[in-house]
Amino acid sequence: MSLAVEAVKDFLLKLQDDICEALEAEDGQATFVEDKWTREGGGGGRTRVMVDGAVIEKGGVNFSHVYGKGLPMSSTERHPDIAGCNFEAMGVSLVIHPKNPHVPTSHANVRLFVAEREGKEPVWWFGGGFDLTPYYAVEEDCRDFHQVAQDLCKPFGADVYARFKGWCDEYFFIPYRNEARGIGGLFFDDLNEWPFEKCFEFVQAVGKGYMDAYIPIVNRRKNTPYTEQQVEFQEFRRGRYAEFNLVIDRGTKFGLQSGGRTESILISLPPRARWGYNWQPEPGTPEARLTEYFLTKRQWV
């Protein structure tokens, strides 16, 4: 079986370009700085970073394409049959941390993984999704975000949105805090239940859907006035974001264990965060409502 790996790579490179262009237009001040890198074991990538923009305080949009021999533990613990195989992994991953606490943080990722087995068909799967982490959440934004997610899933099956929305709720959860990281979206991994071409079509829809879901929210909220107290709450919630990425996220573990580029992997961390001992928001405030209402498993559409 011949996989259209080059077509996937071309799509990912263009997706990185398109997302950076859309975010630069929304910021209106800062631009992404590109840092090309190579991986000693094979492959490389393009890291693009925006800092101190008018809207985006820190944003990273990464493309990577790495290959080599011998898979890291984070892959083989779920796929022991491919331990020691040659592998190829490529993807676009991004996290956007806006300056204004009324603009949510967003994350998106689309990727392809291929493992070559001698004398056998290659093992392949796609993964990815997108999700939203608001600080001062607005119901309209949450509904619209999930509506885009639901609409892009419909052509691929009646149950696809519900499955991948549920998976997102489960994955982006901090068990030791008993808190969700955000209001969810879509998450999928090990996607090979359809033919390669159909899986690739779905991944393309997810990549483009991220922009349709997120950019309008940025546009609506970026000029909302905010206070220093609200920035402090944003930084407190960013602490939770950092915890998830460092302690739980499989992508971070895979990148670090496979000898990936540390600066690119940790670009998802916020520029500033805070931790307070046993800090709790005042009852009845928007800060309390975030965890009590928005960060619970809800059917938004």
Curated annotation (Swiss-Prot):
Please give the biological process terms from Gene Ontology that the record holds: protoporphyrinogen IX biosynthetic process
Q: Where is this region: Important for dimerization?
A: 49-58, 241-276
Keywords (A to Z) from UniProt: Cytoplasm, Heme biosynthesis, Oxidoreductase, Porphyrin biosynthesis
Superkingdom of the source species: Eukaryota
Catalytic activity of the protein? coproporphyrinogen III + O2 + 2 H(+) = protoporphyrinogen IX + 2 CO2 + 2 H2O
| Active site, renumbered | 107
- Per the database entry, which stretches of residues form a coiled coil? none
Assembly description? Homodimer.
Q: What does this protein do?
A: Involved in the heme biosynthesis. Catalyzes the aerobic oxidative decarboxylation of propionate groups of rings A and B of coproporphyrinogen-III to yield the vinyl groups in protoporphyrinogen-IX.
* Name of the protein in its database record: Oxygen-dependent coproporphyrinogen-III oxidase
